[in-house]
Design a protein with these regions (language model features):
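ABC transporter nucleotide-binding domains
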Residues: 1-151
Length: 151
């Protein structure tokens, strides 16, 4: 089975007025093609910080340790340019945040929001984006995707 993602010795710290807070300490795991992986733990244990690190979303005052390695298909992604991060986030890897209200716009339909991301990253027509979005909803088990797209 091919390795898709490998995280080695991930450590993330944040500078606060009280000093450095280590949010993630020496986390390592591998995700193989075709496998399902869950990051589980109690509140505040670093699940979201780990996921954000993989997505390149840790910003100051946070910092991923220089000793950490995040390899996507064997390539170290930590030094990606802005353009490379945009391509990675849109084409290769995605994240679904737990708090839907913080991540989704309640004034737009689900379909429109998914289509928007598809069109930004794939440069396809509205119809193609609609079909792909509906297919994505069906793949994750959402019933009646054509109806849900309009909600």
């Amino acid at each position: 089975m091919d390795t898709v993602l490998e995280v080695k010795n991930l450590s993330v710290a944040f500078q606060t007025v009280l000093g450095e807070v280590k949010a993630v300490r020496d986390v390592s795991f591998t995700i193989k093609k075709g496998s399902v992986t869950a990051i589980v733990g109690e509140s505040g244990c670093g699940k979201s910080v780990t996921a954000k690190s993989i997505m390149g979303l840790i910003k100051k005052p946070g910092k991923v340790s220089d000793d950490s390695e995040i390899l996507f298909q064997g390539e170290n992604i930590q030094n990606y340019s802005k353009k490379e991060w945009e391509n990675y986030r849109g084409q290769k890897c995605s994240i679904c945040f737990q708090d839907a209200l913080a991540s989704l716009n309640p004034t737009m339909t689900v379909g429109k929001q998914i289509m928007e991301k598809i069109r930004v990253h794939k440069k396809v027509s509205k119809k193609e984006a609609w079909n792909e979005a509906a297919e994505m909803l069906a793949k994750v088990g959402i019933p009646n995707p054509e109806i849900r797209m309009r909600q």
